[in-house]
Amino acid sequence: MLSLLDSVSLPYLILSACLSVILLRRFLAHDKGGSKSIAQGCLPEPRLRQWDPIFGFGIVISQARALRGHRYLEWLRDLHASMPHTKTFSANYGGYRWIFSIEPEILKAVYATNFQNFGVEPIRQHPPGFQPFAHKGVSTSDGDDWSFSRTLIKPFFERSVYVSTDRIKPFADKFMTLLPDDGETFDIQPLLQRWFLDITSEFIFGRSQDSMTHADRAEVTWAMADVLRGGRQRAQTHRILWAFNWDWWFEAVEKVHGFLNPYIRSTLKELEERQQRIKDGLPVDEERTDLLWSMATMLPDEEELRSQVCLIFVPNNDTTSMFIGHCLYFLARHSNAWKRLRDEVDAVGDAPITFEMLRNMKYLNGILNESMKPKPLSSKLTLALTTLCTPAHRLIPNNVTQVRAALSDVVLPLGGGPNGKAPLDVRKGDIVSVTKTVMYRDPDQWGPDANEYRPERWDGMRGGWHFLPYGGGPRRCPAQMMVQNESAYMLFRLAQKYSTIVARDPEPFRARMRIGPSSMHGVKIAFYK
């Protein structure tokens, strides 16, 4: 026996062992369904044809190349287009069974009906993809850890906070002073990012970064963008991290931590000193009201607090500014839509801009829901397609896919059988990924004009599981109304000031994936009063 082993090379033994483990796991997984799934009418789902059906590394590598080549949207569209006779199918993804779907009922099951059966820890926390950037937080945890993270932030997203337009006004006023003269071409995306960095830093840390006055203070924004871009790539290629050079990502993480650490350390020190003064019976100043202070009172550990703050501040610093940029990108290419928005704004007159007013403006909210659409998609372009708390709207949602891991065996209402209409047996460890942008362009849900930008389609339309901009069920984004209020306010102010918006970018839309898709070429426009 020993002589036989001596004649076999070590790499061959390792390869054979890996192959045996994967085959055994796949056999055991397919053997677990048993009589229970049969009794519920479950049928096998259609499976993607793969050149590497055993290890499933082919699809992992092709996705990694798409992300690095800024073709992720195209990759997702082509993936679903390759299975035209079903809305749900599976693939072997690095040895795991991934179930891809555009069925609203499956999204409903994952979000709400079977919420307890699905989680995010196996895909966002247990693999090393996000570390050392962050570990536990509202978007990476399940169970009690998730409930605690939600408790940390929930008070700051109550109605009394998100309805305020007074909080937005001074930052919008400053933003308006930075816009160039009539007819001058400029990229509005960096200005939007500086605006949102300032308003967010005041909300979270109690003092604004003031990057609209001091542009150099916005450098951390670019580091955060790299963290998000790399985080997505690492999360989706965590089984082959060794195949890539991640030095650039670790440098970005170090810059972001270097930005946050002084805020966190000074807050913890101030909190400790305040508590000591209270204990000694000494007078104290009025207590701070920012989010970081509130979180520190419940979580006074520096490393754990930083993880929680990272997963709130960094992803959400990118989303609202990117979302508004998407809306303007499209409005600059559709003059009639801008005119209709102007007419709605003019009809309000000089009335104060309030949350209730913005919520009742039908066309403005139609623009927010419909979001942005680039040039018409060719046969090779994706229907477009991330996950933390992000504004995900119809044509190019920031939340591109909704991915969950099965924490226990469960039966989904659809997905089985050759056309995906029978119940589907999902086993513990399987991954369910709902591709929102393909679902948001599905003619069966939206009609023959599903690929067209029509804000008016939302007039009288009721919501449903086929369109969930901010998620649903217990994990619904707590910042939904705040994002809507901030975005609506900024579009209102711009339409109030400028009669015309013109596109000045000859490049077709190409998405760079961060927390969601952003235009590689920015949003180059010109305004006219």
From Swiss-Prot:
Pathway assigned in UniProt: Secondary metabolite biosynthesis
Any one Gene Ontology cellular component term annotated for this protein: membrane
Principal subcellular localisation of the protein: membrane
Localisation per UniProt entry: Membrane
Molecular function GO labels: heme binding; iron ion binding; monooxygenase activity; oxidoreductase activity, acting on paired donors, with incorporation or reduction of molecular oxygen
Phenotype seen when the gene is deleted: Fails to produce tenellin, and leads to the accumulation of 11-hydropretellenin A, 12-hydropretellenin A, 13-hydropretellenin A, 14-hydropretellenin A, 12-oxopretellenin A and prototellinin D.
Gene expressing this chain: tenA
Membrane-spanning residues: 8-24
CC cofactor: heme
Membrane topology annotation: Single-pass membrane protein
SUPFAM superfamilies hit by this protein: Cytochrome P450
Chain sites annotated for binding heme: C477
Keyword annotations from UniProtKB, A to Z: Iron, Membrane, Metal-binding, Monooxygenase, Oxidoreductase, Transmembrane, Transmembrane helix
Keyword Transmembrane helix part of the UniProt annotation: yes
Organism of origin: Beauveria bassiana (strain ARSEF 2860)
Family per similarity comment: Belongs to the cytochrome P450 family.
Protein name, UniProt field: Cytochrome P450 monooxygenase tenA
EC assignment: 1.-.-.-
Up-regulation conditions: Expression is positively regulated by the cluster-specific transcription factor tenR and is induced during cocultures with the natural competitor fungus Metarhizium robertsii.
Function: Cytochrome P450 monooxygenase; part of the gene cluster that mediates the biosynthesis of tenellin-type 2-pyridones, iron-chelating compounds involved in iron stress tolerance, competition with the natural competitor fungus Metarhizium robertsii and insect hosts infection. TenA catalyzes an oxidative ring expansion of pretenellin A and 14-hydropretellenin A to form the 2-pyridone core, leading to the production of pretenellin B and pyridovericin, respectively.
